C-alpha cells in the first residue's frame, strides 16, 4: 500500500481505505479462484495496482467519462482506476466468468459504485465508450479491430477517444501499422521500481 501513497499522496480517506482493502480481498479470492499468479500475489500493489494506475500518466479522465476495461481478469486495470476516478464510469468485461465474479465481489466489498461488469467476449459488447483500456490482452492490431465499434464519437477529454493499453517489452513491430498516431509512454519515467523498466502505456486515438 505504501507504494501507492508514494506516487499518489493526495488520495482521499475513502480512496486510501479502498486501496488498503484490496490486499486481503485478493489474497482471499485468489486462494479460491486463481486470477493472479500465486507467486506474484505478494507483489499485488506494485505489479497490479500501481501498474494499472500507470494509465494516469497519459490522461486524467474528466468526470462523466465512460471507459470499458477489456479482458479485465480479476479487475485490472479497471478497479484501481475506478477507485482513483470516482466520477468516471467503468465497464469491466471478461470472457471468463469466474474472473468476472472475483472482480465483482472485490468491487462490491470496497463499495465501488462506478463499475459494472459483464461476462462476455469482446465481440459481444456493442455499447460505446470514450476509451477502452486493456492490459496486454492481445496484439494491438487485433484489439483495435475488435474495439473500433465501441469508441464513441463524442469527445470530452484532453485526448481524443481511443484505446489505452498497458504493454511490456519491444513494441515496434506491434505498433508499426499505427506508428503515425500511436503514442508510447515509458512507465520507467514515472515509477522508479525495476518492474517498470520495460513497461509502457500505449495510446491509439480511434
Residue ranges and their predicted role:
Residues 140-150:
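A short, conserved alpha-helix within the catalytic core of class I
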Amino acid at each position: 500500500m505504501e507504494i501507492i501513497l508514494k506516487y499518489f499522496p493526495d488520495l482521499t480517506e475513502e480512496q486510501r481505505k479502498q486501496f488498503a482493502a484490496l490486499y486481503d480481498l485478493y489474497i482471499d479470492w485468489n486462494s479460491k479462484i486463481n486470477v493472479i499468479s500465486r507467486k506474484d500475489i505478494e507483489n499485488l500493489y506494485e505489479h497490479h495496482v500501481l501498474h494499472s494506475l500507470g494509465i494516469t500518466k497519459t490522461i486524467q479522465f474528466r468526470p462523466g467519462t465512460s471507459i470499458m476495461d477489456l479482458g479485465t481478469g480479476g479487475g485490472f486495470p479497471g478497479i484501481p482506476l475506478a477507485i482513483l476516478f470516482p466520477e468516471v464510469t467503468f465497464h469491466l468485461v471478461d470472457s471468463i466468468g469466474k474472473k468476472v465474479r472475483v472482480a465483482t465481489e472485490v468491487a462490491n466489498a470496497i463499495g465501488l459504485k462506478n463499475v459494472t461488469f459483464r461476462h462476455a467476449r469482446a465481440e459481444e459488447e456493442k455499447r460505446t465508450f470514450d476509451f477502452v483500456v486493456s492490459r496486454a490482452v492481445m496484439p494491438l492490431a487485433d484489439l483495435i479491430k475488435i474495439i473500433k465499434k465501441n469508441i464513441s464519437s463524442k469527445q470530452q477529454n484532453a485526448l481524443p477517444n481511443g484505446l489505452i493499453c498497458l504493454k511490456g517489452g519491444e513494441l515496434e513491430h506491434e505498433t508499426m501499422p499505427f506508428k503515425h498516431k500511436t503514442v508510447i509512454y515509458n512507465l520507467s519515467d514515472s515509477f522508479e521500481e525495476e518492474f517498470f523498466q520495460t513497461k509502457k502505456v500505449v495510446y491509439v486515438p480511434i
